[in-house]
Amino acid sequence: MSAEVISAPLTPVEKWLDGAALSSIYSSSYWNDIEEEKSKEWWIADGSTAAFARLEAYLERSGLMQSYRIAEKFLAGLAERDLLVADLAAGIGWTACLLSKLPNVSSVHAVDISEHRLEQLFPQAIRMFDGVAGKLKRSLGSFYDLRIADASVDVVFIAAAFHHAANPLRLLSEIDRVLSPGGHLILAAENVVSVAAVVRRMIRKLLHERKLCTNFYELFPPDDILGDHYYRVSDYYFFSQLLGYEVLNFVVTRPQTATVILRKSVS
């Protein structure tokens, strides 16, 4: 990586979507609600030390950073150099910034549907995490419709966002399109519903509704507001089989949080 690239300034946000197209995306109004965002731990727009400390504490407390470190250790150990990474639903860009610091990563393309996160918070995240601005690219767009060439990305990284996909199979199909043969899909800090959680909800439903329910999707329906899905370990393995990907690592870091690393077939 040349010194010119490393020292290059952050380029403007590339806008794949106009206002009308953005507003048509399910849940985009929630992710673009600035007033709502101001109450969140990741609101670091003022660039203050207090804001950074609050975000850092949240990332540690929530297990997000622990999950990210598992993914980072894996990526840092890859023999491949000049990796091209797509960070989907990148949010404020904390993962993209950390990924940009890895010596074997040449660029990180951060995609999100939240304009203020990309425009206002992302530059502050670069400061906070010492991100390499010259390696970073930001695009306002949907992860269902990536303006990225076929088989051109070495790593697709998604942190705590895969479950937000109202149509997970459509998202996986788009990921498979842009991921190069032998490339890796990393799902960090994703929800994984334990057997104990299923049993507890079955008992609760039995007690309150006098109904014995064994249907997982009835016990854990998608969230009404965001469309969030809930997944079991078996669901992630089903997704991998559907894609024909190999499961390289599946680490449950907390009772309901997992890091999943998949590899696409080379053929």
Language model regions located:
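Conserved alpha-helix/loop element of class I SAM-dependent methyltransferases that forms part
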Residues: R61-R81
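A short glycine-rich, Lys/Arg-flanked "PGG" loop and its adjoining helix->strand segment in the class I
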Residues: L169-P181
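N-terminal, positively charged/glycine-rich alpha-helical extensions of SAM-dependent methyltransferases
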Residues: M1-A53
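Conserved beta-strand signature within the Rossmann-like core of class I S-adenosyl-L-methionine
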Residues: G182-E190
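Class I SAM-dependent methyltransferase Rossmann-like catalytic core
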Residues: S48-S67
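C-terminal alpha-helical "lid/dimerization" subdomain adjacent to the S-adenosyl-L-methionine
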Residues: N191-L243, N249-V252
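Class I SAM-dependent methyltransferase SAM/SAH-binding core
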Residues: I92-D145
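A conserved beta-strand element that flanks and buttresses the S-adenosyl-L-methionine
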Residues: F157
